[in-house]
A protein has these predicted regions:
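Amphipathic alpha-helical hairpins
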Residues: 1-116
Length: 116
């Protein structure tokens, strides 16, 4: 991507959102593949899917300089926080959830930085 059109602060947030989306998808896939835990993982998987979608949309809107980028970052931070809380509940059972929670916290903070 031509980052000359995107300042470094925006690029950092875009990269973090994209990384978080991938981490959430990986966590969701890991949860689905764990048959003995599948029944307990429903909320975690739903939060991960919502978070992945929101992170992807936020990154795309920021990349094209949307006038709604700050609002998207605010919503993204909220959803990342919710996903992190849900993943933390399962973090002692699954490493993917623990890693996802940490990435979601990082993404929420980057999105909050964009609102300043």
């Amino acid at each position: 991507m031509n980052t000359s059109l995107i300042n470094q602060k925006n690029q950092t947030c875009i990269d973090t959102c994209n990384e978080c989306a991938m981490m959430c998808e990986a966590c969701c896939t890991e949860c689905m593949s764990n048959t003995e835990m599948a029944g307990m993982m429903g909320r975690c998987m739903m939060k991960c899917r919502d978070c992945a979608m929101m992170c992807t949309m936020t990154a795309m809107m920021m990349a094209r300089g949307s006038e709604y980028s700050k609002q998207m970052c605010e919503m993204c931070a909220t959803i990342c926080d919710a996903c992190a809380m849900e993943c933390e509940k399962m973090g002692n059972k699954m490493e993917a959830c623990k890693e996802c929670a940490e990435m979601c916290k990082k993404c929420a903070q980057e999105c909050r930085n964009m609102m300043r």
